[in-house]
Swiss-Prot record:
UniProt keywords, alphabetically: Plasmid
Classification via Pfam families: HisK_N
Protein's recorded name: Uncharacterized protein pXO2-61/BXB0075/GBAA_pXO2_0075
Length: 136
């Protein structure tokens, strides 16, 4: 799995601008959202964090600070947290599509899908949890 994981990290790093550009075309960002620029910055930061997570340079707990920040921005913007979930899933789907392009064998694919799901599930869970905790 290490080889395919390195390939995925290198692919995402080398094509980060294109990845973000493609992601921006599919995300939901309201015109009235005071954090619309910050949404893009958060996406860039989370892509870097995802790469670091795959390289085992950070743990899942280290993205919880970002989760709290995003939750606060969504509350302040008075938007539904579902938009964040949608935007996060757009990124996850893009990464899964890239993974299939790299043509891993079944065992590598399953192991990487597990890592991808762990990262994005943790991110969504802690952001939504923090959103409702802060909103209360």
């Amino acid at each position: 799995m290490e080889e395919i994981k390195c390939l995925l990290c290198r692919y995402l790093k080398e094509r980060q601008e294109k990845f973000i550009s493609d992601w921006k075309k599919k995300v939901i960002i309201r015109e009235r959202d005071p954090y619309k620029e910050e949404i893009i910055k958060n996406g860039e930061h989370l892509l870097s964090a995802f790469i670091m997570y795959l390289k085992e340079e950070i743990s899942l707990q280290e993205i919880e600070i970002t989760s709290k920040k995003i939750a606060r921005e969504r509350i302040d913007a008075k938007v539904n947290i579902a938009e964040f979930i949608h935007n996060t899933n757009v990124a996850k789907i893009e990464i899964m599509n890239i993974l299939t392009l790299l043509n891993p064998d079944l065992q590598q694919y399953q192991a990487l899908v597990k890592k991808i799901n762990q990262f994005f599930d943790h991110l969504i869970y802690y952001t939504v949890h923090s959103y409702y905790e802060q909103k209360a």
